[in-house]
Amino acid sequence: MKNISLLGASGSIGTQTLDVLRSHPDQFRLVAFSVGKNIDYAVKVIQEFSPQIVSVQREEDVLKLQSVSGNTKIVYGSEGLLEVALHPDAEIVVNAVVGSVGLLPTLRAIEAKKTIGIANKETLVTAGHLVMEAARKHNVSLLPVDSEHSAIFQCLNGENEKRISRLIITASGGSFRDKTRDELHHVTVEDALRHPNWSMGSKITIDSATMMNKGLEVIEAHWLFGIPYEQIDVVLHKESIIHSMVEFEDRSVMAQLGSPDMRVPIQYALTYPDRLPLSDTKQLNLWEIGTLHFEKMDQERFRCLRFAYEAGKAGGSMPAVMNAANEVAVEAFLQKRIGFLTVEDLIEKAMNHHNVIARPSLEEILEIDAATRRFVMEQI
C-alpha cells in the first residue's frame, strides 16, 4: 500500500489520478490532497477517500468544508499546500497543480525525501536547476507524469543514458494545427478549447494550441534527462499514438506507443518499477489506425515553440520569465481580453525586456515571476 498526497485534485491530471487510485484501492491510499475553489468536488473526494488533510485556496472555504469533513483536517492557502506536500505518511507526492504555484511545494517535498510524480511542467521550467540539484542531494526520484516524458523514461529503462543521440518529442499540433497564421487572427476561445485528441484543462489546452505546451515539455525534458537542447527535437504527429521516441548513437530508435489516455502515464509513475492492469483503457490495434503521420515542426508557424528553445538555451532566469508571461497572457485570452496571437506578442515582449540572471536563487525566481506578471498585465 502506497500513501499518496495529491496537489491539484480537481484539475484534469488530478481527477484522472483519483481514477487510478479508485481502480486499485488495495494498492494506494490518498492521505492528503489540495483543491482550488471547487469545494463541492472536494466534499465528494473527502467522502470517498477519507484523507487526513485537505487544503483549499481560500480561507472562507475552510468553514464550509469543516462542517462535512469529519476527521479530515482542513487547511488553506500556500501554507496549506505545503502541509499537503509534506504529509508525514505520504510516500509519493503527485504535483498536478497548474502554474508556478507548484514550485515551492515540490522543493519542500524533495527536501523531505518524498518521491515526486511530476505533472506540473512549470516547476522544472522555472527552476529546473534548483529542483534537479535538490533531487540529487536528497536522493529523490522525479517520476514523469506527462505522457511524452513518461514515454522517454520508459524507453530509457535499462539503457545507458550516455548513449543517447536524440530525444524526439511528439506533438499533436493542438486545436489549430491545420490553420494558417492568417486564420489564427480570428479564432475564438471556444475554438481553442476543442483539442482533437486529449481531454485536458483549459490552460494546457490553450498552451497546446499555441505550442507553448510542447515548448515547456522541451525544457522539462532537458532537465529530467540531462540532454542538451540541440539534441531534443519535436515532430508533429497528429494521431498521438507514439508518445515520444529516443534515438541512440547507433541510430536505433525506441518509441513508446499507446491509445491517448493520461491514466497510463499517471499509473506508471505511481507503480514504478511495476505495472498494474488498466483494463478500461482502449487497447491499441494498429490495423484500426492504418497510417501514422509525421511532419517537421515549423517554428515560425509555432512561435511559442521557438521562444521556448530560445529561453531554454539562454538559461538562468529566462524560462521563468517566459512561463510567467505565458500564464498571464493565456489567462487574458481565456477572459477574451486579448486575441489569440497576442499571447505570442506578450511573451516576446517580456523576454526582450528581461536581463538574464545566470543562476537565480529561489527568492530571485519568485521575484522575477511576480515582476514579469506585472509587466505583462501593464501591456494588456
Curated annotation (Swiss-Prot):
Q: In which pathway does it act?
A: Isoprenoid biosynthesis; isopentenyl diphosphate biosynthesis via DXP pathway; isopentenyl diphosphate from 1-deoxy-D-xylulose 5-phosphate: step 1/6
Listed GO molecular functions?
1-deoxy-D-xylulose-5-phosphate reductoisomerase activity; manganese ion binding; NADPH binding
Query: Which GO BP annotation is one of this protein's?
Result: isopentenyl diphosphate biosynthetic process, methylerythritol 4-phosphate pathway involved in terpenoid biosynthetic process
Provide the residue positions that the database annotates as binding Mn(2+): D146, E148, E217
* Residues reported to bind NADPH: S10, G11, S12, I13, G36, K37, N38, N120, E122, G201
Alphabetical keyword list = Isoprene biosynthesis, Manganese, Metal-binding, NADP, Oxidoreductase
User: What is any Pfam family matched here?
Assistant: DXP_reductoisom
Positions with a binding annotation for 1-deoxy-D-xylulose 5-phosphate: K121, S147, E148, S172, H195, S208, N213, K214, E217
Instruction: Write down the chemical reaction(s) this protein catalyses.
Output: 2-C-methyl-D-erythritol 4-phosphate + NADP(+) = 1-deoxy-D-xylulose 5-phosphate + NADPH + H(+)
Q: Which InterPro entries match?
A: DXP_reductoisomerase, DXP_reductoisomerase_C, DXP_reductoisomerase_N, DXPR_C, DXPR_C_sf, NAD(P)-bd_dom_sf
Is Oxidoreductase there in the keyword field? yes
Gene3D superfamilies per record: 1.10.1740.10, NAD(P)-binding Rossmann-like Domain
Q: Which family does it belong to?
A: Belongs to the DXR family.
Role, per record: Catalyzes the NADPH-dependent rearrangement and reduction of 1-deoxy-D-xylulose-5-phosphate (DXP) to 2-C-methyl-D-erythritol 4-phosphate (MEP).
Specify the protein name.
Answer: 1-deoxy-D-xylulose 5-phosphate reductoisomerase 2
- Which species is the source of this protein? Bacillus cereus (strain ATCC 14579 / DSM 31 / CCUG 7414 / JCM 2152 / NBRC 15305 / NCIMB 9373 / NCTC 2599 / NRRL B-3711)
GN (gene name):
dxr2
